Amino acid sequence: ACFIGDDTKDIYLTFDEGYEYGQTESILNTLKEKGVSATFFVTEPYAKDNPDLVRRMIDEGHVLGNHSVTHPSAGMPSLSLDKQENEVTENHAYIKENFGDDMYLFRYPTGRFREQSLALLNNCNYKSIFWSFAYLDYDVNNQPDHASSLQKMKDKLHPGAIYLLHAESETNAAVLGDFIDAVRAAGYGFKNF
């Protein structure tokens, strides 16, 4: 697992990519305009369905992370260790073969894991990336209010914060630029893994 335990005033923006609802291009545009690099955790179906967006992520200096093949809704612990390994290695092989990117970060679907899962990732030369901030942004049919979402994000700002945002969220696409500006106004910067 990766814990950023320093006191530098930097934060990490991460986006989970399981489905595309037309918001990722706007997010990439904002990141480019603001000069911020982020980590995008992609599933294999997402990469297959959106190769131009994945290529753009890489070309614009973002880090790709592995988010499994099928994004099991019951979490990785619901699978046998062999199936968990397949979730990691199959997506890794697909991204490596089709995009030339050698991913080394993994985010557990739903955040669920067990000790054996961590050992498996270590054996696959992966680091687990969790988060210190997440909110209910993933339901495209029930998007949170822009102003309150931005305030929640600002309220959780702290050195080493890892923000988990879902790229299918219209709210995240709408407030990202303002959030980046607020982070910088508070004296913080952005890092990537």
Model-inferred region functions:
Residues 11, 36-37, 134-137, 163:
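N-terminal start-of-chain detector that recognizes signal peptides
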Residues 15-18, 41-45, 68-69, 107-111, ...:
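Active-site-proximal beta-strand/loop segments in catalytic clefts of secreted hydrolases
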Residues 23-26, 72-101, 112-159, 172-178:
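Alpha-helical scaffold elements lining the catalytic groove of polysaccharide deacetylases
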Residues 1-76, 81-97, 101-103, 178, ...:
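Active-site beta->alpha N-cap acidic-glycine motif
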Residues 157-193:
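Catalytic grooves of carbohydrate-active enzymes
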